[in-house]
Amino acid sequence: IPVTFNNCRTIYDMAEKVSRCLALDSASLISLLQDKRNLAKYGFSLEQLPAMFIPNTYNMFYDTDEQEFVQRMANEFKLFWNDARKAQISRIGLQTPSEVSTLASIVYGEQSVNADEWPIIAGLYLNRIKKGIKLQSDPTFKFCWGDQLNGVQRLLAIHRNIDCPYNTYKIKGLPPGPINMPPSAVLDAVLNAAEVNFIFMCAKPDYSGRHNFAVTGEEHMRNARIFQNWLTLEQKKKKQ
Protein backbone atom coordinates (compact mmCIF):
# COMPACT_ATOMS: atom_id res chain seq x y z
CA ILE A 1 0.00 0.00 0.00
CA PRO A 2 1.17 3.59 -0.61
CA VAL A 3 2.61 5.32 2.45
CA THR A 4 2.87 9.10 2.09
CA PHE A 5 4.31 11.57 4.54
CA ASN A 6 4.97 15.21 3.74
CA ASN A 7 4.66 18.58 5.47
CA CYS A 8 6.02 16.99 8.64
CA ARG A 9 7.78 19.24 11.11
CA THR A 10 8.98 16.56 13.52
CA ILE A 11 9.43 12.79 13.81
CA TYR A 12 6.20 12.85 15.86
CA ASP A 13 4.23 14.28 12.90
CA MET A 14 5.80 11.69 10.61
CA ALA A 15 5.06 8.77 13.00
CA GLU A 16 1.43 9.92 13.27
CA LYS A 17 1.00 9.99 9.46
CA VAL A 18 2.72 6.64 8.92
CA SER A 19 0.67 4.93 11.66
CA ARG A 20 -2.50 5.88 9.76
CA CYS A 21 -1.28 3.87 6.74
CA LEU A 22 0.44 0.89 8.37
CA ALA A 23 -0.34 -1.50 11.22
CA LEU A 24 2.53 -0.13 13.30
CA ASP A 25 2.08 1.94 16.45
CA SER A 26 3.27 5.58 16.41
CA ALA A 27 4.40 5.55 20.08
CA SER A 28 6.44 2.36 19.52
CA LEU A 29 7.96 3.90 16.39
CA ILE A 30 9.00 7.02 18.33
CA SER A 31 10.59 5.03 21.16
CA LEU A 32 12.47 2.91 18.60
CA LEU A 33 13.71 6.07 16.85
CA GLN A 34 14.86 7.63 20.11
CA ASP A 35 16.74 4.51 21.22
CA LYS A 36 20.44 5.43 21.42
CA ARG A 37 21.56 2.08 19.96
CA ASN A 38 19.35 2.60 16.94
CA LEU A 39 20.61 6.14 16.44
CA ALA A 40 24.19 4.86 16.58
CA LYS A 41 23.35 2.06 14.14
CA TYR A 42 22.10 4.53 11.53
CA GLY A 43 24.69 7.21 12.35
CA PHE A 44 22.40 10.06 13.43
CA SER A 45 22.08 12.19 16.53
CA LEU A 46 18.52 12.67 17.80
CA GLU A 47 18.58 16.24 16.45
CA GLN A 48 19.73 15.09 12.99
CA LEU A 49 17.25 12.21 12.82
CA PRO A 50 14.60 14.02 10.70
CA ALA A 51 17.22 14.12 7.91
CA MET A 52 16.88 10.34 7.51
CA PHE A 53 13.25 10.64 6.41
CA ILE A 54 12.84 11.96 2.88
CA PRO A 55 9.16 12.80 2.21
CA ASN A 56 7.69 10.80 -0.64
CA THR A 57 5.13 8.09 -1.36
CA TYR A 58 6.55 4.63 -0.63
CA ASN A 59 4.93 1.28 -1.34
CA MET A 60 4.96 -1.01 1.70
CA PHE A 61 3.10 -3.98 3.11
CA TYR A 62 0.36 -3.09 5.60
CA ASP A 63 1.95 -5.30 8.26
CA THR A 64 5.36 -3.54 8.02
CA ASP A 65 6.55 -3.22 11.63
CA GLU A 66 8.45 -0.34 13.25
CA GLN A 67 11.90 -1.88 12.73
CA GLU A 68 11.21 -2.71 9.07
CA PHE A 69 9.89 0.80 8.44
CA VAL A 70 13.01 2.45 9.91
CA GLN A 71 15.28 0.11 7.93
CA ARG A 72 13.37 0.94 4.73
CA MET A 73 13.81 4.67 5.39
CA ALA A 74 17.55 4.17 6.05
CA ASN A 75 17.80 2.33 2.71
CA GLU A 76 15.90 5.12 0.90
CA PHE A 77 18.24 7.68 2.49
CA LYS A 78 21.25 5.79 1.08
CA LEU A 79 19.63 5.56 -2.36
CA PHE A 80 18.94 9.30 -2.39
CA TRP A 81 22.44 10.23 -1.22
CA ASN A 82 24.24 8.69 -4.19
CA ASP A 83 27.84 9.57 -5.10
CA ALA A 84 26.79 12.45 -7.38
CA ARG A 85 24.80 14.16 -4.62
CA LYS A 86 27.50 13.49 -2.02
CA ALA A 87 30.06 15.16 -4.31
CA GLN A 88 27.89 18.30 -4.41
CA ILE A 89 27.97 18.70 -0.61
CA SER A 90 31.56 19.91 -0.31
CA ARG A 91 31.16 21.97 -3.50
CA ILE A 92 28.61 24.18 -1.71
CA GLY A 93 30.75 24.34 1.44
CA LEU A 94 28.82 21.92 3.68
CA GLN A 95 30.05 18.63 5.14
CA THR A 96 27.27 16.07 5.56
CA PRO A 97 23.83 15.11 4.19
CA SER A 98 22.39 16.13 7.59
CA GLU A 99 23.76 19.66 7.15
CA VAL A 100 22.20 19.84 3.68
CA SER A 101 18.90 18.64 5.15
CA THR A 102 19.13 21.22 7.94
CA LEU A 103 19.71 24.08 5.49
CA ALA A 104 16.98 22.70 3.18
CA SER A 105 14.55 22.68 6.13
CA ILE A 106 15.27 26.39 6.72
CA VAL A 107 14.81 27.14 3.00
CA TYR A 108 11.51 25.21 3.04
CA GLY A 109 10.47 26.98 6.26
CA GLU A 110 11.01 30.33 4.52
CA GLN A 111 9.41 29.29 1.23
CA SER A 112 7.04 26.33 0.87
CA VAL A 113 5.12 27.54 -2.20
CA ASN A 114 7.35 29.15 -4.85
CA ALA A 115 9.96 26.55 -5.75
CA ASP A 116 11.88 28.94 -8.04
CA GLU A 117 13.05 30.82 -4.92
CA TRP A 118 14.60 27.74 -3.25
CA PRO A 119 18.04 27.91 -4.97
CA ILE A 120 18.19 31.69 -4.36
CA ILE A 121 17.37 31.40 -0.64
CA ALA A 122 19.88 28.53 -0.36
CA GLY A 123 22.55 30.70 -2.02
CA LEU A 124 21.75 33.58 0.34
CA TYR A 125 22.18 31.42 3.46
CA LEU A 126 25.36 29.80 2.13
CA ASN A 127 26.72 33.36 1.70
CA ARG A 128 25.94 34.06 5.36
CA ILE A 129 27.62 30.82 6.47
CA LYS A 130 30.75 31.63 4.43
CA LYS A 131 30.89 35.19 5.79
CA GLY A 132 30.30 34.08 9.39
CA ILE A 133 27.05 36.08 9.60
CA LYS A 134 24.25 34.62 11.74
CA LEU A 135 21.52 33.08 9.57
CA GLN A 136 18.77 35.07 11.36
CA SER A 137 16.00 32.92 9.93
CA ASP A 138 12.53 33.45 11.40
CA PRO A 139 11.39 29.81 10.92
CA THR A 140 14.20 28.69 13.27
CA PHE A 141 12.98 30.68 16.25
CA LYS A 142 9.36 29.81 15.37
CA PHE A 143 10.44 26.15 15.66
CA CYS A 144 11.63 26.91 19.22
CA TRP A 145 8.13 28.12 20.14
CA GLY A 146 6.39 24.97 18.86
CA ASP A 147 2.78 25.78 17.88
CA GLN A 148 2.58 28.95 19.97
CA LEU A 149 3.26 31.34 17.07
CA ASN A 150 0.86 29.71 14.59
CA GLY A 151 -1.15 32.45 12.88
CA VAL A 152 0.98 35.28 14.31
CA GLN A 153 1.64 37.65 11.40
CA ARG A 154 3.88 40.22 13.02
CA LEU A 155 6.86 38.62 14.74
CA LEU A 156 8.46 40.71 17.47
CA ALA A 157 11.83 41.01 19.19
CA ILE A 158 10.38 39.18 22.21
CA HIS A 159 9.75 36.15 19.94
CA ARG A 160 13.26 36.30 18.48
CA ASN A 161 14.89 36.48 21.90
CA ILE A 162 14.09 32.90 22.90
CA ASP A 163 17.12 30.95 24.18
CA CYS A 164 17.16 27.78 22.12
CA PRO A 165 19.89 25.92 20.18
CA TYR A 166 17.80 26.21 16.99
CA ASN A 167 17.38 30.00 17.15
CA THR A 168 19.67 31.33 14.41
CA TYR A 169 19.33 34.86 15.79
CA LYS A 170 21.33 33.57 18.78
CA ILE A 171 23.61 30.87 17.33
CA LYS A 172 26.18 31.11 14.53
CA GLY A 173 25.92 28.71 11.62
CA LEU A 174 23.38 25.93 11.22
CA PRO A 175 21.16 24.64 14.03
CA PRO A 176 21.84 21.10 15.36
CA GLY A 177 19.33 19.50 12.99
CA PRO A 178 16.42 20.09 10.58
CA ILE A 179 13.37 22.12 11.67
CA ASN A 180 11.11 20.10 9.32
CA MET A 181 11.42 17.27 6.80
CA PRO A 182 12.09 19.03 3.49
CA PRO A 183 11.01 17.38 0.20
CA SER A 184 13.76 15.93 -1.99
CA ALA A 185 13.32 18.80 -4.50
CA VAL A 186 14.40 21.26 -1.78
CA LEU A 187 17.46 19.14 -0.93
CA ASP A 188 18.39 19.24 -4.63
CA ALA A 189 17.79 23.01 -4.74
CA VAL A 190 20.31 23.44 -1.90
CA LEU A 191 22.84 21.18 -3.65
CA ASN A 192 22.35 23.34 -6.76
CA ALA A 193 22.19 26.66 -4.93
CA ALA A 194 22.19 29.80 -7.06
CA GLU A 195 25.38 31.86 -7.07
CA VAL A 196 23.99 35.15 -5.82
CA ASN A 197 25.35 38.07 -3.79
CA PHE A 198 22.25 38.37 -1.61
CA ILE A 199 22.58 38.47 2.19
CA PHE A 200 19.05 39.61 3.12
CA MET A 201 15.47 38.70 2.28
CA CYS A 202 12.12 40.15 3.21
CA ALA A 203 8.55 39.14 2.37
CA LYS A 204 7.04 41.09 -0.55
CA PRO A 205 4.22 43.50 0.37
CA ASP A 206 1.51 41.29 -1.14
CA TYR A 207 0.01 37.85 -0.67
CA SER A 208 2.28 36.10 -3.21
CA GLY A 209 4.49 34.48 -0.54
CA ARG A 210 7.49 35.72 -2.53
CA HIS A 211 10.52 37.72 -1.31
CA ASN A 212 12.55 40.81 -2.09
CA PHE A 213 16.26 39.98 -1.88
CA ALA A 214 18.97 42.48 -1.00
CA VAL A 215 22.76 42.76 -0.95
CA THR A 216 23.08 45.71 1.45
CA GLY A 217 21.59 46.40 4.87
CA GLU A 218 20.19 49.74 3.64
CA GLU A 219 18.34 48.08 0.77
CA HIS A 220 16.99 45.46 3.17
CA MET A 221 15.80 48.07 5.71
CA ARG A 222 13.91 49.81 2.91
CA ASN A 223 12.26 46.51 1.88
CA ALA A 224 11.42 45.71 5.52
CA ARG A 225 9.87 49.15 6.09
CA ILE A 226 7.70 48.80 2.97
CA PHE A 227 6.54 45.36 4.13
CA GLN A 228 5.78 46.50 7.72
CA ASN A 229 3.78 49.50 6.44
CA TRP A 230 1.82 47.22 4.11
CA LEU A 231 1.14 44.78 6.95
CA THR A 232 -0.13 47.60 9.20
CA LEU A 233 -2.54 48.78 6.46
CA GLU A 234 -3.76 45.22 5.84
CA GLN A 235 -4.41 44.68 9.55
CA LYS A 236 -6.34 47.97 9.73
CA LYS A 237 -8.47 46.88 6.75
CA LYS A 238 -9.34 43.62 8.52
CA LYS A 239 -10.48 45.49 11.63
CA GLN A 240 -12.85 47.75 9.68
Language model features with spans:
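Bacterial extracytoplasmic/cell-wall-associated proteins, especially those involved in peptidoglycan
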Residues: E16, L22-A27, N38-Q240
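Structural preference for solvent-exposed beta-strand-turn elements
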Residues: L33-R37
